[in-house]
């Protein structure tokens, strides 16, 4: 099959998230495949002939058998730390999820900005040499989120499981020198919630139980507008024996026990705005946005403040947008108009943006072909967004 013929095939778009991987065919409005990006291996000895076959589990099967498995994420803070497992996940996407062959479809792959060059080099090597893809294109996640929102100007705040970054884009031009990134995101919130629950007497220690903590975080946590005031209210409620304090929430654990959640619900996501709580020297998420905007030309700042677009699972936390707005107001120039857009589909917006971009006929010249890659592997750094 000629290269140009292969390029007319539907591209595959893979949003390679630290916590959740999204994959599907370009041109579709949502990913066909969506599952936690971990690999599970049985941690117990198999003694019965009828036991489940296989020694590696990925996707929904890994979620179902979570309690039997040792769970490992191959991506940490946006960077692949285990390439063998990463390759297994990509293979699983092709064979089990999309049910297609890698040789016939170009691939659009996402990655976090300011990642080490070696991460992209290795990914390209796997796709071209192991999967024999006809063409590849690598894009920064935030840029695609802006595509999905239908804008060409804005600052995208993308906070997923491993990385939080703010990327200013003006009339379609990304500004690499203004990109700000912090390695504090959803997984750190999960780990801190795990610690807070341990302090209150509920211990989750296995890798599978940590997944339960993640679900508790997603269902029960919220961001408060005023943490000091909220803290006082909780302290007063506990002093007055407030067992029925209205903000307490119950969560039913898989074994049927009920967990009562108190102040942990807002204390855990608070680390996004105040990373010092966990001893980190990173700036808060609101500071990251303002820093990114303040690094661009004075003339452009006004329109960026008026177009802040949220993306990624961590921004779905209840109260996140309101708190972000109030914190940015405090840091920004007095009369500047601040508008935050929170698209309802922002959990998938990077993938949706990639799907739109890869299906454009004008995008065809952007692909890095296998032939170009063989001649000059460095081209994947030059031909990218």
Curated annotation (Swiss-Prot):
It comes from Pneumocystis carinii. One of its GO terms (molecular function) is ATP binding. It is found in: Cytoplasm, Cytoskeleton. One of its GO terms (cellular component) is cytoplasm. This is Actin-2. Belongs to the actin family. ARP1 subfamily. SUPFAM superfamilies: Actin-like ATPase domain (SSF53067). Gene3D superfamilies: 3.30.420.40, Actin, Chain A, domain 4 (3.90.640.10). It comes from the Eukaryota. Keywords: ATP-binding, Cytoplasm, Cytoskeleton, Nucleotide-binding. Its main location: cytoplasm. Pfam families: Actin (PF00022).
């Amino acid at each position: 099959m000629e290269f140009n013929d292969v390029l007319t095939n539907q591209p595959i778009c893979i949003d390679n998230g630290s916590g959740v991987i999204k994959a599907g065919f370009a041109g579709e409005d949502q990913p066909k495949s969506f599952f936690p990006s971990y690999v599970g291996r049985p941690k117990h000895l198999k003694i019965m002939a009828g036991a489940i076959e296989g020694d590696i589990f990925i996707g929904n099967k890994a979620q179902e058998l979570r309690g039997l498995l040792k769970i490992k994420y191959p991506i940490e803070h946006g960077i692949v730390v285990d390439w063998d497992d990463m390759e297994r996940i990509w293979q699983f996407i092709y064979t089990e999820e999309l049910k297609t062959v890698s040789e016939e479809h170009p691939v659009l792959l996402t990655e976090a900005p300011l990642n080490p060059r070696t991460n992209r080099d290795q990914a390209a090597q796997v796709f071209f040499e192991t999967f024999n893809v006809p063409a590849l294109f690598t894009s920064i996640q935030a840029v695609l989120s802006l595509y999905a929102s239908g804008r060409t100007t804005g600052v995208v705040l993308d906070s997923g499981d491993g990385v939080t970054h703010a990327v200013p884009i003006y009339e379609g031009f990304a500004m690499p020198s203004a990109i700000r990134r912090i390695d504090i995101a959803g997984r750190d919130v999960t780990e801190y919630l795990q610690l807070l629950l341990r302090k209150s007497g509920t211990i989750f220690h296995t890798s599978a139980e940590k997944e339960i903590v993640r679900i508790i975080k997603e269902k029960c946590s919220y961001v408060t507008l005023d943490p000091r005031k909220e803290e006082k209210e909780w302290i007063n409620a506990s002093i007055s024996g407030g067992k029925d304090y209205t903000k307490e929430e119950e969560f039913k654990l898989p074994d049927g026990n009920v967990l009562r959640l108190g102040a942990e619900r807002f204390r855990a996501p608070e680390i996004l705005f105040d990373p010092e709580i966990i001893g980190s020297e990173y700036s808060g998420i609101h500071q990251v946005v303002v820093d990114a905007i303040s690094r661009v030309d004075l003339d452009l700042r006004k329109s960026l403040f008026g177009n802040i677009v949220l993306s990624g699972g961590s921004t779905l936390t209840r109260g996140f947008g309101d708190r972000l707005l109030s914190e940015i107001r405090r840091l920004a120039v007095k009369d500047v108009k601040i508008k935050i857009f929170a698209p309802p589909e922002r959990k998938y917006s990077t993938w949706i943006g990639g799907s739109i971009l890869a299906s454009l006929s004008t995008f065809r010249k952007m692909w890095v072909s296998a032939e170009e890659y063989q001649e000059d592997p460095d081209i994947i750094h030059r031909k990218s967004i």
